[in-house]
């Protein structure tokens, strides 16, 4: 049975995620006028686009809200963001710049905590401002039902009566004026902005056109680093981690993780760090474009991954990146609390993050232009003396050891040579006219003639001494692999 209502449930309490903007304000007033009982819930997520979040519930009451609550979600959002940082749960990357999934993080927290707050007031119907074309409608749907299995969903923007009467900003403002309700006649921006303590998303309207660049966006968490008239002095900053968590900035400890993130935002923001322009695949696989800010997360991420690379081996790093990317996509789809996500999170936090302790000092300049000045920690796998070109004592291995290691490589090199000889015989390589077609042929500029027998020559040990021959036979007779 569908959980989504397509008409207003008159006489019932309807919870609305209330931002205080025109859309949600007119929705509350319209629902009250048509006989429903609107109850508003505003999430304090440290949003940088709302300077007076504490006043929002009173605004909701002006429009007819029966209940108007402010729910402090900052601590929970910071904790989920730190988990994402530890796991590298960021799958959207382009040209070396990442989107740090700041909006999906916010939806996981608000979609859960607001519905839990509604339950306390016996509100079993929930609505928000997400549209049917975007990601948020599915994210909120999933998190809402996880928090309250009995939840029903009513979105005014899916109600034909609401859309017919109030289909645009002009109609909404005229409706409020006609009903003697306040309307803040703010200038409509050229794009839409959504923000929380971890970052800001700018999208839609003019930004839907790819010939409109990032420089048309006015940062709300940082500075216009691309503008030469904006003076940005270089700054050195040291980030300290303990078991995968950032704990200090320039040696200073903070009363709460929220305070640390605010300071990271301030430091990264004054250099324009963490701003990226991304084309991404929405949940429904349609492509969209967003311009993102995340100065604090970008700063912490740069320091964290420096330590990760100094501490963990190659296979662990590969798993970290592969599973982190998968976890990022799951979060993007609204599956941050699903079992498969919890499994990946637990693994990465336990086996990758717990070992990450140390400090990284960076020199920040403009945007992503920074240098790493120092990296220290108690348990690095990086040991410069082991690979030094100078004479060292207690070296891990010597020339003879490396000769033996190279000799062991003969087996797989011989196997590769045998395959190349086979491909040459088929006309796949070593010729300008591949027999099976150019689309199936690899680049062959480095490969010349491939006479047979090369593989055997590589794998052969040549003449061996009598002692080595005896050892080989002994190993075979004893069944040793």
Curated annotation (Swiss-Prot):
It is found in: Cytoplasm. L-citrulline binds at residues 99, 135, 139, 192, 201, 203, 280. It catalyses: L-citrulline + L-aspartate + ATP = 2-(N(omega)-L-arginino)succinate + AMP + diphosphate + H(+). L-aspartate binds at residues 131, 135-136. One of its GO terms (cellular component) is cytoplasm. GO terms for biological process: argininosuccinate metabolic process; L-arginine biosynthetic process; urea cycle. One of its GO terms (molecular function) is argininosuccinate synthase activity. Pfam families: Arginosuc_syn_C, Arginosuc_synth. ATP binds at residues 17-25, 43, 129, 131, 136, 194. Its EC number is 6.3.4.5. Pathway: Amino-acid biosynthesis; L-arginine biosynthesis; L-arginine from L-ornithine and carbamoyl phosphate: step 2/3. Keywords: Amino-acid biosynthesis, Arginine biosynthesis, ATP-binding, Cytoplasm, Ligase, Nucleotide-binding. Belongs to the argininosuccinate synthase family. Type 2 subfamily. Homotetramer. This is Argininosuccinate synthase. It comes from Streptomyces coelicolor (strain ATCC BAA-471 / A3(2) / M145).
């Amino acid at each position: 049975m569908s959980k989504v209502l397509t008409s207003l449930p008159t006489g019932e309490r309807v919870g609305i995620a209330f931002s205080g903007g025109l859309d949600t304000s007119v929705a509350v007033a319209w629902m009250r006028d048509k006989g429903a009982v609107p109850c508003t819930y505003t999430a304090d997520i440290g949003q940088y686009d709302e300077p007076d979040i504490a006043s929002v519930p009173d605004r909701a009451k002006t429009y007819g809200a029966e209940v108007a609550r402010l729910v402090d979600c900052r601590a929970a959002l910071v904790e989920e963001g730190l988990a994402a940082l530890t796991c590298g749960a960021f799958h959207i990357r382009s040209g070396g710049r990442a989107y740090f999934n700041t909006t999906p993080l916010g939806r996981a927290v608000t979609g859960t905590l607001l519905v839990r707050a509604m339950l306390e007031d016996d509100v079993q119907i929930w609505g928000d401002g997400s549209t049917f074309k975007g990601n948020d409608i599915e994210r909120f749907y999933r998190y809402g039902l996880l928090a309250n299995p009995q939840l029903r969903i009513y979105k005014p923007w899916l109600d034909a009566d609401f859309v017919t009467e109030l289909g645009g900003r002009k109609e909404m403002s005229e409706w409020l004026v006609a009903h003697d309700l306040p309307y803040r006649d703010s200038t409509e921006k050229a794009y839409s902005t959504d923000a929380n303590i971890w970052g800001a998303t700018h999208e839609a309207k003019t930004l839907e056109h790819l010939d409109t660049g990032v420089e048309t966006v006015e940062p709300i968490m940082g500075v216009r680093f691309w503008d030469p008239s904006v003076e940005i002095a270089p700054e050195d900053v040291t980030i300290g981690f303990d078991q995968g968590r950032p704990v200090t900035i320039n040696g200073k400890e903070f009363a709460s993780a929220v305070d640390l993130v605010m300071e990271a935002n301030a430091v990264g923001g004054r250099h324009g760090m963490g701003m990226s322009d991304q084309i991404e695949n929405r949940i429904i696989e349609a492509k969209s474009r967003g311009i993102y800010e995340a100065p604090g997360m970008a700063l912490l991420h740069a320091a964290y991954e420096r330590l990760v690379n100094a501490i963990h081996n190659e296979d662990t790093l590969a798993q970290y990146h592969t599973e982190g990317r998968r976890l990022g996509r799951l979060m993007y789809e609204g599956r941050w609390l699903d079992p498969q996500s919890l499994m990946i999170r637990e693994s990465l936090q336990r086996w990758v993050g717990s070992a990450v302790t140390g400090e990284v000092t960076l020199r920040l300049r403009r945007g992503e232009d920074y240098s790493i000045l120092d990296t220290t920690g108690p348990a690095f796998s990086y040991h410069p003396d082991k690979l030094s070109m100078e004479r060292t004592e207690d070296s891990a291995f010597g020339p003879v050891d490396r000769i033996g290691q190279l000799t062991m490589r003969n087996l797989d090199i011989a196997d590769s040579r045998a395959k190349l000889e086979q491909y040459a015989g088929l006309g796949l390589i070593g010729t300008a006219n591949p027999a099976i077609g150019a689309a199936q042929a690899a680049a062959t500029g480095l490969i010349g003639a491939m006479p047979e027998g090369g593989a055997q020559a590589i794998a052969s040990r040549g003449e061996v001494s009598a002692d080595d021959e005896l050892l080989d036979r002994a190993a075979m007779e004893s069944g040793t692999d």
